[in-house]
């Protein structure tokens, strides 16, 4: 119903919903965690690609942590603070970010059978019961 929709939408707008993504990166990260703060805007000459732009980009922040390294690839958690288009993909691949694209990212890295980025967990306040609710689903990689 409309009231439920508005209550859920409000949580997204206020950025109170907690999101956790898991990604497999094409390389080895030395650091264990951090925050990436790179403003993004659309690449007008190459849509839908996004690019880092300090002059005209919108703020984009991503918290991340390393889970494990295996077969010259790094499994990480991403916790987006903002929610820009392609934010996690650009923050992973960009030279000022992690410099390590997501496996299967044909826009910012190299092609594979799939993009190895998965929304693993979503936590929010139930609009009716007011209880904190977490929905999780494991990645298949």
Residue ranges of each PLM-predicted region?
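RNA pseudouridine synthases
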Residues: 1-141
């Amino acid at each position: 119903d409309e009231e439920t929709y508005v209550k859920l939408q409000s949580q997204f707008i206020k950025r109170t919903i907690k999101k956790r993504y898991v990604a497999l990166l094409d390389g080895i990260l030395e650091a264990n965690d951090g925050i990436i703060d790179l403003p993004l805007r659309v690449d007008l000459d190459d849509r839908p690609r996004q690019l880092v732009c300090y002059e005209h980009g919108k703020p984009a922040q991503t918290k991340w942590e390393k889970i494990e390294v295996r077969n010259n690839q790094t499994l990480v958690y991403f916790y987006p603070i903002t929610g820009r288009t392609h934010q996690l993909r650009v923050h992973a691949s960009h030279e000022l970010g992690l410099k390590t694209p997501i496996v299967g990212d044909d826009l910012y890295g190299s092609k594979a059978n799939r993009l190895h980025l998965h929304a693993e967990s979503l936590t929010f306040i139930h609009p009716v019961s007011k209880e904190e609710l977490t929905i999780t689903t494991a990645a298949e990689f």
